[in-house]
Structures are given as structure tokens and as C-alpha cells.
Amino acid sequence: MELVVKSVAAASVKTATLVLPVGENRKLGTVAQAVDQACEGAISAVLKRGDLAGKPGQTLLLQNLSGLKAERVLLVGSGKEEALGDRAWRKLVASVAGVLKGLNGADAVLALDDIAVSNRDAHYGKYRLLAETLLDGEYVFDRFKSQKAEPRALKKVTLLADKAGQAEVERAVKHASAIASGMAFTRDLGNLPPNLCHPSYLAEQAKELGKAHKALKVEVLDEKKIKDLGMGAFYAVGQGSDQPPRLIVLNYQGGKKADKPFVLVGKGITFDTGGISLKPGAGMDEMKYDMCGAASVFGTLRAVLELQLPINLVCLLACAENMPSGGATRPGDIVTTMSGQTVEILNTDAEGRLVLCDTLTYAERFKPQAVIDIATLTGACIVALGSHTSGLMGNNDDLVGQLLDAGKRADDRAWQLPLFEEYQEQLDSPFADMGNIGGPKAGTITAGCFLSRFAKAYNWAHMDIAGTAWVSGGKDKGATGRPVPLLTQYLLDRAGA
């Protein structure tokens, strides 16, 4: 779908469908009043009959109104006079998109300037959410269906904006398009079956991306290099699999050579059986999503490349498959990490932190401004925060605050959990420097505490996206593309874009 921005009178546009808002009590805004005048009061006459109450998301389609060049007028309820919240605004836009998809029109014009969204400016903030909602709603994953989804008639949507705000709306659409593209790539990777999407496949995807962008350098570390670097924890996770582990390094140079990079670290467990600590069979198919941390880093990089942000960014994808076999790691094994610290592996299903801890040590060589790791790390995070909010921890209050703010601005929220020193004691082991689990209490926090021991050399934050990376079951089952909006917003803020 193509999104364009224009500053013209709604009453004069030639389109298959013109979309106008109607408030509760059938109140028309300034733009809709002008259109109503052009069609000699046909809209207000329909509203007087009570066919549309104006509640948020309600729609009414009118055909062939005289005096207009639009073939149809779609009225959408915008609620009471007070501003809509983010969720209500997204639902309204999705409602409009649902109607437009059912029509045979190739284009539509949205004249929604009269709707206010709380805590969003009238141009960039409001239209960024609108554009992301429209574009993300276009996503379809039917690669393995013998019958593909039918092509949609709607190819182009024009957003009408006043002249004063047109440039900001265009900037919003530009950013939203890049974010939606990154989310779609993330969702594609997450939704792929694990027999195809394994560590080597992700490495090939990285190389293809590197070929397409001169500013991006790609290096793939194989299992021998991982072992030679002393990454005993990372190497241990992949021991039971026929698919060898890979550490994928993507280095984007968009800023000055002397600028310190931001580093994103993604957990890329392409399938997680739990290893010898085998998971229950029910729902195990969804463990293909255990690489969504790496996928979201990949998607964020795609957005950064599309926007050509003037920053330096290093993406580290820690990829392995966690399988049981005669060569797999056992509960009770002790490994030495790249940092020199030793870990007693008490549960092989707590493997994400093992690939991440060595990758966090590896990140030191880039002398980063900040390091953010993203992982589907703990089921405890789903218990704590559900599927709406990502967990967030870190060792630097400014960094954590910046990420929380980015989440609010991108409508991709996170919530901070503590890393109090008392929680560290739960990781004590009688045989090694630490265990890889901290008991049944505060599982998300103790996982963060574990990682914090490998991130002391720089400002660091950890995002647990176990509840937000995918939707379980039902017709909407699949990867969500989160937290690409939050991460991209954070980098947009750092770039001053």
C-alpha cells in the first residue's frame, strides 16, 4: 500500500472513497462540514435519521453523493469531543481499514485532521500511529499456503493534512513505513518453520542484507570460532543439535567514524525444546518464536537502513538450536564463559541467558555508547506483565528512561523491573560462580541479574519480550514484530531524526 500526503480541500478530491469523521451526537467537524455543504447537506440529512451515532469506530458508507468527485463517502465515528487515546485511535483506523479492504476501490482519501489524539501532536504523533496501523494491518503470511490470499484492490491511501503540518505528516509516514517494513521482516522470520529457519539460514539472510547495503558489514562466527573465543556458555547450548550455532555480527556505519556505536543483542534460539530439561509437548510448536529477539534486532536494522540514520549501530545475533541428544548439555554441567566466570547449568531450558552472556562480553570490543539485549527470555515475564507490555531492566537509569519514553512515543510499551542486589543471591551455586537459574521466585528479575554480571563494562538494558513477541493460538497466531517500534524510536531519538 502506498501512502501519500496532500494539502487540498476534501470536497474537491477525486477518489473511490473519502473518509470523514463524525463525533457523538452526530457532530461534524470543520472538514466534514465543508464536504456536507458541497453535497447540499446530504451527510447531515443521513445523520439526522440516526443511522450513525458517532461512537468510536462505527462506520456508515454513503454512495454517489451529488456535488462530490468521490464515488463513496465513508463516515467513521470519532466519539466524544475529548481526545482519543492511542488504543481507541488505532481501533478507529483499523475499523476504517477493514471497510476499505472490503470495497473494490483502488484508492482512498482520509480526511481525519479534526480528530484529536491525547498526548499526540496533531501532525507527526497522530499520523505516525495511523500510518503504522494501516501498514502493519496489510501483513499476510501465506508463504506455505497452496491458496494465497487474494490481492487487495486498495493500492493507495492519501492523507489530507493542513499546509502548516504537511511536512510533519510526511515525516511521520516516512518513519512509519520504515518501522512497518522492519516489523514485517521480523514477523516473517518469526513465522518461518524451524526446519527452514535455523542459525545458518539467519546467517545467510544477514549476508544478503550486507550485499544490498554498502554501509553494512557482516561477519558470521561459526561454532569453531565461538569455541576458540572461550564462549563456553554459548557453545554449550548448541551441543545437542545437528544445526551448528552462529554468532552473526552486523556493523552499520551511518555516523562519523569516531562515533561510538549503539549495540543491539538478540537472542536467536531458532527452536527450543528445552534440551535435556525437556519442555511439555503442548504448544511446543511455538518455540520457533524463541528467536524473536534476534528477529526484532534484524527488523530494527532494516528500519535504520531504510531511514539511513546518521548513527553507528552494531547488531549481534546469538543463534543456536536447543535440542536433546547424547551430546547435549546436562543439568549439573559447569561451563566457563568468555568473561572467565563459571556457570553451573541447573536447567538446560534456561539457555537464552547462556548465549546472551557470552555475546554481552563480546560486545565490549565495540566500546559502545549503550547495549540493549532483546530476548524471549522467561515465562515469568508473561505471568508478571501479560502480553501487552515488555519487561525492562538495566544498570543505567538514563538508558532505561530513554527506552521507556521511546516505548510510550511508539505505543510499544515496556515496564521497568528492579535489579536489587538481594535478588543476586538467588543465583548462588556451591560449585560454580553462579547457577543459570535462581529458583521459582522473581524469575524474570533473576534472569536479568544473571545477564547484569556480564554487562558491567557499559550502559546496558535488557528487554524480556516473552509475552509480546508473538500471539498464541487462534486466527491471529503469529509473530507481532515487537519491539521494533520501540527500538527504532529509541534510535530515531538518538539520531535526532
Curated annotation (Swiss-Prot):
Q: Which family does it belong to?
A: Belongs to the peptidase M17 family.
Q: What is its EC number?
A: 3.4.11.1, 3.4.11.10
Positions that bind Mn(2+) 1? D272, D349, E351
Keyword Cytoplasm in the entry? The reply is: yes
What is the taxonomic lineage of the source species?
Answer: Bacteria, Pseudomonadati, Pseudomonadota, Gammaproteobacteria, Pseudomonadales
Residues that, per the record, bind Mn(2+) 2: K267, D272, D290, E351
Give the Gene3D superfamilies listed for this entry. Answer: Leucine Aminopeptidase, subunit E, domain 1 (3.40.220.10), Zn peptidases (3.40.630.10)
The gene coding this protein? pepA
> What is the disulfide pattern of this chain?
none
Where does it mainly reside? cytoplasm
List the cofactors: Mn(2+)
Single GO cellular component term: cytoplasm
Query: What InterPro entries does the entry give?
Result: Leucine_aapep/pepB, Macro_dom-like, Peptidase_M17_C, Peptidase_M17_leu_NH2_pept, Peptidase_M17_N
- Report the function annotation for this chain: Presumably involved in the processing and regular turnover of intracellular proteins. Catalyzes the removal of unsubstituted N-terminal amino acids from various peptides.
Instruction: Tell me yes or no: is Ion transport among this UniProt entry's keywords.
Output: no
Where it sits in the cell: the answer is: Cytoplasm
Indicate what this protein is called per its UniProt record. Answer: Probable cytosol aminopeptidase
Which UniProt keyword terms apply here?
Aminopeptidase, Cytoplasm, Hydrolase, Manganese, Metal-binding, Protease
